[in-house]
Protein backbone atom coordinates (compact mmCIF):
# COMPACT_ATOMS: atom_id res chain seq x y z
CA UNK A 1 0.00 0.00 0.00
CA UNK A 2 1.51 3.26 -1.06
CA UNK A 3 1.99 5.98 1.51
CA UNK A 4 0.06 9.19 1.05
CA UNK A 5 2.18 11.88 -0.50
CA UNK A 6 3.52 14.37 1.99
CA UNK A 7 2.81 18.01 1.48
CA UNK A 8 5.87 19.84 0.39
CA UNK A 9 7.15 22.48 2.75
CA UNK A 10 7.09 26.00 1.38
CA UNK A 11 10.39 27.31 0.13
CA UNK A 12 12.38 28.91 2.88
CA UNK A 13 11.02 27.02 5.89
CA UNK A 14 8.00 25.41 7.52
CA UNK A 15 4.38 26.04 6.49
CA UNK A 16 3.18 29.45 7.70
CA UNK A 17 0.41 29.45 10.33
CA UNK A 18 -2.66 31.65 9.71
CA UNK A 19 -2.35 35.19 11.09
CA UNK A 20 -3.93 35.73 14.50
CA UNK A 21 -7.31 37.51 14.51
CA UNK A 22 -7.13 41.24 15.13
CA UNK A 23 -7.72 42.23 18.74
CA UNK A 24 -11.24 43.45 19.48
CA UNK A 25 -11.60 47.23 19.72
CA UNK A 26 -11.55 48.63 23.24
CA UNK A 27 -15.00 49.13 24.80
CA UNK A 28 -14.90 52.92 24.49
CA UNK A 29 -14.00 52.77 20.80
CA UNK A 30 -16.67 50.15 20.19
CA UNK A 31 -19.25 52.33 21.93
CA UNK A 32 -18.30 55.34 19.82
CA UNK A 33 -18.52 53.31 16.62
CA UNK A 34 -22.01 52.16 17.57
CA UNK A 35 -23.00 55.71 18.43
CA UNK A 36 -21.79 56.95 15.04
CA UNK A 37 -23.77 54.22 13.31
CA UNK A 38 -26.96 55.05 15.23
CA UNK A 39 -26.57 58.79 14.72
CA UNK A 40 -26.02 58.11 11.02
CA UNK A 41 -29.43 56.43 10.88
CA UNK A 42 -31.08 59.45 12.48
CA UNK A 43 -29.27 62.06 10.40
CA UNK A 44 -29.96 60.21 7.15
CA UNK A 45 -33.71 60.42 7.84
CA UNK A 46 -33.43 64.17 8.43
CA UNK A 47 -31.39 64.63 5.26
CA UNK A 48 -33.82 62.65 3.10
CA UNK A 49 -36.74 64.72 4.36
CA UNK A 50 -34.95 67.99 3.59
CA UNK A 51 -33.88 66.72 0.18
CA UNK A 52 -37.43 65.69 -0.75
CA UNK A 53 -38.76 69.02 0.44
CA UNK A 54 -36.32 70.90 -1.81
CA UNK A 55 -37.15 68.68 -4.77
CA UNK A 56 -40.94 68.53 -4.36
CA UNK A 57 -41.84 71.54 -2.23
CA UNK A 58 -45.13 70.04 -1.00
CA UNK A 59 -44.45 69.44 2.69
CA UNK A 60 -47.91 67.92 3.27
CA UNK A 61 -47.28 65.24 0.65
CA UNK A 62 -43.73 64.61 1.88
CA UNK A 63 -44.86 64.29 5.49
CA UNK A 64 -47.74 61.96 4.59
CA UNK A 65 -45.38 59.65 2.69
CA UNK A 66 -42.89 59.82 5.55
CA UNK A 67 -45.54 58.76 8.09
CA UNK A 68 -46.46 55.80 5.87
CA UNK A 69 -42.84 54.56 5.68
CA UNK A 70 -43.09 52.24 8.69
CA UNK A 71 -39.76 50.53 8.09
CA UNK A 72 -37.78 53.77 8.16
CA UNK A 73 -39.73 55.11 11.12
CA UNK A 74 -39.20 51.95 13.15
CA UNK A 75 -35.48 52.00 12.38
CA UNK A 76 -35.38 55.65 13.44
CA UNK A 77 -37.26 54.98 16.70
CA UNK A 78 -34.97 52.07 17.62
CA UNK A 79 -31.88 54.17 16.91
CA UNK A 80 -33.14 57.10 18.99
CA UNK A 81 -34.03 54.87 21.94
CA UNK A 82 -30.65 53.15 21.75
CA UNK A 83 -28.87 56.50 21.68
CA UNK A 84 -30.83 57.71 24.69
CA UNK A 85 -30.46 54.52 26.73
CA UNK A 86 -26.85 53.60 25.99
CA UNK A 87 -25.07 56.79 24.95
CA UNK A 88 -26.74 60.05 25.98
CA UNK A 89 -27.40 58.73 29.48
CA UNK A 90 -23.63 58.36 29.94
CA UNK A 91 -23.00 62.06 29.31
CA UNK A 92 -24.13 64.96 31.41
CA UNK A 93 -25.97 66.80 28.66
CA UNK A 94 -27.70 63.78 27.17
CA UNK A 95 -29.63 63.47 30.41
CA UNK A 96 -29.36 67.21 31.00
CA UNK A 97 -32.12 68.21 28.60
CA UNK A 98 -34.67 66.11 30.49
CA UNK A 99 -33.36 67.30 33.85
CA UNK A 100 -33.44 70.89 32.57
CA UNK A 101 -37.13 70.54 31.68
CA UNK A 102 -37.89 69.15 35.14
CA UNK A 103 -35.89 71.91 36.81
CA UNK A 104 -37.72 74.65 34.91
CA UNK A 105 -41.11 73.12 35.73
CA UNK A 106 -40.25 72.89 39.43
CA UNK A 107 -38.97 76.46 39.47
CA UNK A 108 -42.07 77.74 37.69
CA UNK A 109 -44.89 75.70 39.21
CA UNK A 110 -43.54 74.81 42.66
CA UNK A 111 -40.92 77.39 43.65
CA UNK A 112 -42.57 80.73 42.91
CA UNK A 113 -41.57 81.32 39.29
CA UNK A 114 -45.16 81.50 38.10
CA UNK A 115 -46.15 83.92 40.86
CA UNK A 116 -43.22 86.20 40.01
CA UNK A 117 -44.16 86.16 36.32
CA UNK A 118 -47.80 87.02 37.08
CA UNK A 119 -46.79 89.81 39.45
CA UNK A 120 -44.46 91.17 36.79
CA UNK A 121 -47.37 91.17 34.33
CA UNK A 122 -49.40 93.10 36.88
CA UNK A 123 -46.66 95.69 37.33
CA UNK A 124 -46.39 96.15 33.56
CA UNK A 125 -50.15 96.63 33.29
CA UNK A 126 -50.14 99.12 36.16
CA UNK A 127 -47.31 101.16 34.66
CA UNK A 128 -48.98 101.08 31.25
CA UNK A 129 -52.25 102.35 32.72
CA UNK A 130 -50.40 105.23 34.35
CA UNK A 131 -48.37 106.19 31.30
CA UNK A 132 -51.16 106.03 28.70
CA UNK A 133 -53.17 109.04 29.96
CA UNK A 134 -49.94 111.00 30.42
CA UNK A 135 -49.23 110.80 26.71
CA UNK A 136 -52.35 112.85 25.94
CA UNK A 137 -52.24 115.18 28.93
CA UNK A 138 -50.69 118.63 28.71
CA UNK A 139 -49.38 118.43 32.27
CA UNK A 140 -47.08 115.81 33.75
CA UNK A 141 -48.88 113.06 35.66
CA UNK A 142 -49.25 113.26 39.41
CA UNK A 143 -46.35 111.62 41.20
CA UNK A 144 -47.51 108.77 43.42
CA UNK A 145 -45.79 106.19 45.55
CA UNK A 146 -44.02 103.78 43.18
CA UNK A 147 -45.94 100.54 42.77
CA UNK A 148 -48.36 100.80 45.71
CA UNK A 149 -50.62 97.91 46.69
CA UNK A 150 -52.07 96.22 43.64
CA UNK A 151 -55.83 96.03 43.19
CA UNK A 152 -57.64 93.33 45.13
CA UNK A 153 -59.15 91.96 41.93
CA UNK A 154 -55.72 91.31 40.42
CA UNK A 155 -54.48 89.65 43.61
CA UNK A 156 -57.53 87.40 43.64
CA UNK A 157 -56.92 86.47 40.01
CA UNK A 158 -53.29 85.58 40.75
CA UNK A 159 -54.28 83.50 43.79
CA UNK A 160 -56.95 81.67 41.81
CA UNK A 161 -54.52 80.99 38.98
CA UNK A 162 -51.94 79.60 41.40
CA UNK A 163 -54.49 77.39 43.15
CA UNK A 164 -55.37 75.82 39.80
CA UNK A 165 -51.77 74.63 39.57
CA UNK A 166 -52.07 72.34 42.59
CA UNK A 167 -51.82 68.61 41.92
CA UNK A 168 -49.81 66.89 39.23
CA UNK A 169 -48.41 68.86 36.31
CA UNK A 170 -50.07 67.68 33.09
CA UNK A 171 -47.26 67.34 30.54
CA UNK A 172 -47.44 66.54 26.82
CA UNK A 173 -44.15 65.24 25.39
CA UNK A 174 -44.27 65.56 21.59
CA UNK A 175 -41.90 63.25 19.72
CA UNK A 176 -41.47 61.40 22.99
CA UNK A 177 -39.97 58.18 21.56
CA UNK A 178 -39.29 56.46 24.91
CA UNK A 179 -41.33 58.57 27.40
CA UNK A 180 -38.46 59.94 29.55
CA UNK A 181 -40.77 62.02 31.80
CA UNK A 182 -42.82 59.04 32.95
CA UNK A 183 -40.44 58.34 35.84
CA UNK A 184 -40.99 61.73 37.49
CA UNK A 185 -43.75 61.69 40.11
CA UNK A 186 -44.73 65.35 39.76
CA UNK A 187 -45.93 64.87 36.16
CA UNK A 188 -49.02 63.30 34.65
CA UNK A 189 -47.29 62.54 31.38
CA UNK A 190 -48.72 61.92 27.92
CA UNK A 191 -46.01 60.95 25.44
CA UNK A 192 -46.83 60.93 21.72
CA UNK A 193 -44.83 59.98 18.62
CA UNK A 194 -45.47 58.96 15.02
CA UNK A 195 -43.77 55.63 15.81
CA UNK A 196 -43.42 55.02 19.57
CA UNK A 197 -40.38 53.10 20.78
CA UNK A 198 -42.14 51.91 23.97
CA UNK A 199 -45.71 50.87 24.76
CA UNK A 200 -46.36 53.77 27.14
CA UNK A 201 -46.11 56.29 24.25
CA UNK A 202 -49.23 56.97 22.19
CA UNK A 203 -49.12 56.91 18.40
CA UNK A 204 -49.98 60.39 17.12
CA UNK A 205 -49.14 62.64 14.17
CA UNK A 206 -48.92 65.97 15.96
CA UNK A 207 -48.87 68.01 12.75
CA UNK A 208 -52.33 66.70 11.86
CA UNK A 209 -53.74 66.50 15.40
CA UNK A 210 -57.25 67.96 15.63
CA UNK A 211 -57.78 70.43 18.49
CA UNK A 212 -61.27 70.34 20.02
CA UNK A 213 -63.09 72.62 22.46
CA UNK A 214 -61.62 72.72 25.99
CA UNK A 215 -63.08 70.43 28.65
CA UNK A 216 -65.30 72.15 31.21
CA UNK A 217 -64.32 69.78 34.01
CA UNK A 218 -62.68 69.86 37.43
CA UNK A 219 -58.96 69.16 37.67
CA UNK A 220 -59.36 65.60 38.95
CA UNK A 221 -61.81 64.83 36.14
CA UNK A 222 -59.34 66.13 33.56
CA UNK A 223 -56.63 63.94 35.10
CA UNK A 224 -58.96 60.93 34.82
CA UNK A 225 -59.64 61.82 31.17
CA UNK A 226 -55.91 61.79 30.38
CA UNK A 227 -55.45 58.41 32.04
CA UNK A 228 -58.10 56.89 29.76
CA UNK A 229 -56.89 58.14 26.37
CA UNK A 230 -57.32 55.75 23.44
CA UNK A 231 -54.44 54.75 21.18
CA UNK A 232 -53.82 56.16 18.56
CA UNK A 233 -54.61 59.79 19.38
CA UNK A 234 -56.23 61.76 16.54
CA UNK A 235 -57.66 64.68 18.54
CA UNK A 236 -57.31 66.37 21.93
CA UNK A 237 -59.24 69.12 23.73
CA UNK A 238 -57.62 72.53 23.87
CA UNK A 239 -56.21 74.09 27.06
CA UNK A 240 -55.49 70.62 28.44
CA UNK A 241 -51.83 70.69 29.51
CA UNK A 242 -49.67 72.73 31.85
CA UNK A 243 -46.51 71.88 29.86
CA UNK A 244 -45.78 70.96 26.23
CA UNK A 245 -42.27 69.69 25.46
CA UNK A 246 -40.58 69.89 22.04
CA UNK A 247 -37.28 68.12 22.75
CA UNK A 248 -35.21 67.90 19.52
CA UNK A 249 -38.53 68.03 17.63
CA UNK A 250 -38.67 71.17 15.51
CA UNK A 251 -35.42 70.53 13.62
CA UNK A 252 -36.87 67.17 12.53
CA UNK A 253 -39.26 68.95 10.15
CA UNK A 254 -37.91 70.09 6.77
CA UNK A 255 -40.17 73.17 6.53
CA UNK A 256 -40.26 76.25 8.79
CA UNK A 257 -44.04 76.32 8.33
CA UNK A 258 -44.32 72.85 9.90
CA UNK A 259 -42.37 74.11 12.92
CA UNK A 260 -44.75 77.06 13.09
CA UNK A 261 -47.82 74.79 13.01
CA UNK A 262 -46.37 72.76 15.89
CA UNK A 263 -45.89 75.89 18.02
CA UNK A 264 -49.40 77.08 17.21
CA UNK A 265 -50.88 73.73 18.25
CA UNK A 266 -48.86 73.86 21.46
CA UNK A 267 -50.39 77.27 22.20
CA UNK A 268 -53.89 75.86 21.70
CA UNK A 269 -53.20 72.83 23.92
CA UNK A 270 -51.72 74.80 26.82
CA UNK A 271 -53.68 76.33 29.66
CA UNK A 272 -53.18 80.05 30.22
CA UNK A 273 -49.73 80.58 31.78
CA UNK A 274 -48.66 77.07 30.79
CA UNK A 275 -45.12 76.41 29.53
CA UNK A 276 -43.80 75.45 26.10
CA UNK A 277 -40.30 73.95 26.42
CA UNK A 278 -38.26 73.99 23.19
CA UNK A 279 -34.90 72.23 22.84
CA UNK A 280 -33.02 72.37 19.56
CA UNK A 281 -29.52 71.06 18.69
CA UNK A 282 -26.56 73.38 18.08
CA UNK A 283 -22.88 72.87 18.93
CA UNK A 284 -21.64 76.32 17.94
CA UNK A 285 -20.73 78.89 20.55
CA UNK A 286 -23.67 80.81 21.92
CA UNK A 287 -23.28 84.09 20.06
CA UNK A 288 -22.88 82.45 16.65
CA UNK A 289 -26.59 81.53 16.54
CA UNK A 290 -27.78 84.61 18.43
CA UNK A 291 -29.59 85.90 15.34
CA UNK A 292 -31.40 82.59 14.87
CA UNK A 293 -32.43 82.40 18.52
CA UNK A 294 -33.66 85.99 18.40
CA UNK A 295 -35.67 85.09 15.31
CA UNK A 296 -37.19 82.04 17.02
CA UNK A 297 -38.03 84.09 20.11
CA UNK A 298 -39.91 86.73 18.13
CA UNK A 299 -41.77 84.15 16.03
CA UNK A 300 -42.90 82.07 19.02
CA UNK A 301 -43.78 85.11 21.14
CA UNK A 302 -45.96 86.40 18.29
CA UNK A 303 -48.30 83.47 18.95
CA UNK A 304 -49.09 84.68 22.46
CA UNK A 305 -46.06 83.55 24.47
CA UNK A 306 -43.36 85.27 26.51
CA UNK A 307 -40.00 83.67 27.00
CA UNK A 308 -39.51 82.68 30.62
CA UNK A 309 -36.04 81.12 30.48
CA UNK A 310 -33.15 80.51 28.10
CA UNK A 311 -30.10 78.26 28.51
CA UNK A 312 -27.26 77.19 26.20
CA UNK A 313 -25.66 73.79 26.61
CA UNK A 314 -22.64 72.88 24.53
CA UNK A 315 -24.81 70.93 22.09
CA UNK A 316 -28.22 72.61 22.27
CA UNK A 317 -30.39 75.64 22.98
CA UNK A 318 -33.08 75.28 25.66
CA UNK A 319 -35.99 77.73 25.90
CA UNK A 320 -39.10 77.99 28.07
CA UNK A 321 -42.05 80.09 26.84
CA UNK A 322 -45.07 81.06 28.97
CA UNK A 323 -48.51 81.28 27.36
CA UNK A 324 -49.73 84.80 28.12
CA UNK A 325 -52.88 85.06 25.98
CA UNK A 326 -55.72 82.67 25.21
CA UNK A 327 -55.90 83.75 21.58
CA UNK A 328 -53.12 83.61 19.01
CA UNK A 329 -52.10 87.20 18.39
CA UNK A 330 -49.80 86.68 15.42
CA UNK A 331 -50.07 89.03 12.44
CA UNK A 332 -49.08 86.94 9.43
CA UNK A 333 -49.91 89.72 6.99
CA UNK A 334 -47.16 92.14 7.95
CA UNK A 335 -44.51 89.66 9.11
CA UNK A 336 -43.42 86.25 7.86
CA UNK A 337 -43.33 84.67 11.29
CA UNK A 338 -43.30 81.03 10.07
CA UNK A 339 -40.17 81.72 8.02
CA UNK A 340 -38.43 83.00 11.13
CA UNK A 341 -38.35 79.47 12.60
CA UNK A 342 -35.43 78.54 10.37
CA UNK A 343 -32.49 76.21 11.02
CA UNK A 344 -29.07 76.40 9.31
CA UNK A 345 -29.77 73.26 7.25
CA UNK A 346 -32.71 75.04 5.56
CA UNK A 347 -30.14 76.96 3.51
CA UNK A 348 -28.16 73.93 2.38
CA UNK A 349 -28.36 72.89 -1.26
CA UNK A 350 -28.81 69.27 -2.28
CA UNK A 351 -25.07 69.19 -3.00
CA UNK A 352 -24.37 70.40 0.54
CA UNK A 353 -26.51 67.59 1.93
CA UNK A 354 -24.67 65.03 -0.17
CA UNK A 355 -21.36 66.45 1.05
CA UNK A 356 -22.45 66.31 4.68
CA UNK A 357 -23.36 62.66 4.17
CA UNK A 358 -19.67 61.80 4.00
CA UNK A 359 -18.05 64.48 6.11
CA UNK A 360 -18.90 67.21 8.56
CA UNK A 361 -19.40 70.54 6.82
CA UNK A 362 -18.60 73.54 9.04
CA UNK A 363 -20.08 76.77 7.74
CA UNK A 364 -17.84 79.83 7.87
CA UNK A 365 -18.71 82.93 9.88
CA UNK A 366 -19.10 84.90 6.65
CA UNK A 367 -21.65 82.37 5.34
CA UNK A 368 -23.49 82.61 8.65
CA UNK A 369 -23.71 86.38 8.28
CA UNK A 370 -25.03 86.05 4.73
CA UNK A 371 -27.72 83.59 5.81
CA UNK A 372 -28.76 85.83 8.68
CA UNK A 373 -28.85 88.99 6.53
CA UNK A 374 -32.56 88.67 5.86
CA UNK A 375 -33.27 88.87 9.59
CA UNK A 376 -31.15 91.92 10.38
CA UNK A 377 -34.23 94.11 10.78
CA UNK A 378 -35.30 92.22 13.91
CA UNK A 379 -35.39 94.41 17.04
CA UNK A 380 -32.74 93.94 19.67
CA UNK A 381 -33.86 91.65 22.49
CA UNK A 382 -30.82 90.90 24.66
CA UNK A 383 -32.84 89.81 27.70
CA UNK A 384 -35.62 87.32 28.34
CA UNK A 385 -39.12 88.78 28.45
CA UNK A 386 -39.83 87.31 31.88
CA UNK A 387 -36.55 86.37 33.51
CA UNK A 388 -34.29 89.20 32.33
CA UNK A 389 -31.48 86.70 31.76
CA UNK A 390 -28.68 87.69 29.42
CA UNK A 391 -27.86 85.57 26.38
CA UNK A 392 -24.17 86.46 26.36
CA UNK A 393 -21.55 83.77 26.63
CA UNK A 394 -17.86 83.43 25.88
CA UNK A 395 -17.57 79.65 26.18
CA UNK A 396 -16.09 78.24 22.95
CA UNK A 397 -17.85 75.31 21.30
CA UNK A 398 -17.47 73.59 17.96
CA UNK A 399 -20.16 72.86 15.43
CA UNK A 400 -21.32 69.55 14.01
CA UNK A 401 -24.38 68.70 11.98
CA UNK A 402 -27.06 67.40 14.38
CA UNK A 403 -24.32 67.43 17.05
CA UNK A 404 -26.45 66.22 19.92
CA UNK A 405 -26.42 62.80 18.30
CA UNK A 406 -22.66 62.50 18.77
CA UNK A 407 -22.09 63.69 22.30
CA UNK A 408 -18.61 62.86 23.51
From Swiss-Prot:
Its EC number is 2.1.1.-. Pfam families: Bmt2. GO terms for biological process: cellular response to amino acid starvation; cellular response to methionine; methylation; negative regulation of TORC1 signaling; positive regulation of TORC1 signaling; regulation of TORC1 signaling. S-adenosyl-L-methionine binds at residues 97, 175, 193, 205-206, 247. Coiled coil: none annotated. It comes from the Eukaryota. Residues 1-16 have a biased composition (Low complexity). The keyword Nucleus does not apply. Residues 1-37 are annotated as: Disordered. InterPro entries: Bmt2/SAMTOR, SAM-dependent_MTases_sf. One of its GO terms (molecular function) is methyltransferase activity. Keywords: Methyltransferase, S-adenosyl-L-methionine, Transferase. Residues 28-37 have a biased composition (Basic and acidic residues). Residues 17-27 have a biased composition (Pro residues). The keyword NADP does not apply. Belongs to the BMT2/SAMTOR family. Interacts with the GATOR1 complex; interaction is disrupted when SAMTOR binds S-adenosyl-L-methionine. Interacts with the KICSTOR complex; interaction is disrupted when SAMTOR binds S-adenosyl-L-methionine. S-adenosyl-L-methionine-binding protein that acts as an inhibitor of mTORC1 signaling via interaction with the GATOR1 and KICSTOR complexes. Acts as a sensor of S-adenosyl-L-methionine to signal methionine sufficiency to mTORC1: in presence of methionine, binds S-adenosyl-L-methionine, leading to disrupt interaction with the GATOR1 and KICSTOR complexes and promote mTORC1 signaling. Upon methionine starvation, S-adenosyl-L-methionine levels are reduced, thereby promoting the association with GATOR1 and KICSTOR, leading to inhibit mTORC1 signaling. This is S-adenosylmethionine sensor upstream of mTORC1. It comes from Gallus gallus (Chicken).
